[in-house]
Every structure is written in C-alpha cells, then in structure tokens.
C-alpha cells in the first residue's frame, strides 16, 4: 500500500492557541515509526514550549535548598527542583554519586528521570570568575556587567546576549570584540557603532546593514571600506 493511501493529511486545532495546523502524511508515518502520538500543539506553540524549557534571561531571588539564604537563580521559586549556590555546587562538600538511582525497566523512563531531576541539586546560575556581575547567567569572566547571558570576557556591559570580549556597551546580540556599541546584532570588531546589523570593523556609524570597514557612515547597507556615506550616497 502506498503511503499516500495509508496516511492522509489532517487539519487539527491547536490545544493552546486554537489555530488550525496541518499534520502531513509523512509526519504520521514518522510518528508511527517512533511510536508516539500525533501532536496536539501547532508547530509555533510547540516551539515556544521547547524554548520555555531553557531559561537564560529571567532571574529570581529564591532560597538556597541547602543553606536557606536567598540566592539569585534562573529557576522560579515555585519549582520543586533543589537549587544551590553555584560556589557550593562546584565544591567538594557534596557527592553527586549519592543521588544515583537504579533504573527500573518496567517503568516509564521520563517518570524516573523527573524523580531524579527533582532530587538532585542544580546550581542556581552559571557565572564563574565574575567581578561585580551577580545578575548575569552563563557569563564567564565578566566584570561590572548587568543582565548579560551566554557571554564571555566582557566589561561594563548591560542587557546583552551571546557577546564575546565587549566593553562599555549595551543592548547587543551576537557581537564580538567591540567597544562603545549600542543596539547592534551580529557585528564584530567595531567601535562606537549604533543600531546596526551584520557589520564588521565599522566605526562612528549609525544604522548600517552588511557593512565592512566603514567610518562615519549613516543609514547605509552593503558598503565596503567607505567613509562619510549617507544613505549609500
């Protein structure tokens, strides 16, 4: 029997947003192969739910599960998981092997995984070798930074994500080796660059897109090694 005869495209209503979405015949074949039921959430809502699993930006005050003192954490205070200060988590004061459990092949894997997850200590956030940068997560070797995440070796930076070796800047996303920048994404090796995207080695410029080696340029795109350009003219 051809797959098209066995499986049909089906339109379902998302249980979350109530919008219709289509499950293709090829999808049904895949679900049957791996023995899982068809989805009840549309792709967009499923994507949001997967994103919700990993939190790097929202920070909370919550009690340390060991000491009871308030710590800064990426985990909401209402979660059942045990959270401890990162210094304790990295120390030799506890043995991770103490939390090991035998796997029961007669029970559902995810039920056992959740039980294990709810008993082992998690570090409240990851922020090693930080100086005056308490409100940062996955931000290694930061100095005088505030609310940055997924970052490395930054100084005096705020409200940024996925940045490397940045100084005196804020509101950046995926920017490297730059200083005095604001509202830039996917840029690197720039100085005093503002409101720009996908630029390299640009200086004293505003509102650029896909520019390289530009100085004192404004509202332009696709420039290479140009100076004093306004709207690509």
Task: Please give the residue ranges for each predicted region.
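Long, distal/terminal scaffolding or interaction modules
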Residues: 1-233
């Amino acid at each position: 029997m051809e797959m098209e005869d066995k499986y049909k495209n089906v339109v379902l209503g998302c249980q979350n947003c109530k919008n219709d979405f289509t499950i293709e015949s090829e999808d049904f074949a895949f679900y049957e192969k791996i023995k899982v039921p068809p989805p009840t959430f549309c792709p967009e809502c499923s994507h949001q739910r997967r994103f919700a699993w990993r939190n790097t930006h929202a920070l909370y005050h919550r009690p340390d599960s060991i000491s009871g003192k308030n710590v800064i954490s990426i985990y909401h205070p209402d979660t059942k998981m045990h959270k401890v200060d990162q210094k304790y988590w990295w120390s030799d004061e506890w043995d991770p092997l103490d939390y090991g459990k035998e796997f029961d092949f007669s029970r559902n894997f995810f039920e056992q995984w959740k039980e294990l997850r709810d008993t082992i200590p998690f570090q409240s956030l990851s922020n090693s070798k930080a100086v005056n940068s308490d409100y940062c997560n996955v931000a290694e070797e930061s100095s005088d930074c505030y609310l940055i995440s997924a970052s490395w070796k930054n100084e005096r930076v705020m409200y940024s994500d996925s940045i490397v070796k940045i100084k005196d800047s804020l509101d950046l996303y995926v920017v490297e080796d730059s200083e005095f920048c604001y509202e830039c994404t996917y840029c690197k090796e720039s100085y005093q660059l503002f409101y720009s995207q996908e630029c390299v080695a640009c200086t004293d410029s505003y509102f650029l897109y896909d520019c390289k080696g530009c100085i004192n340029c404004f509202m332009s795109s696709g420039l290479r090694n140009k100076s004093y350009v306004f709207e690509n003219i």
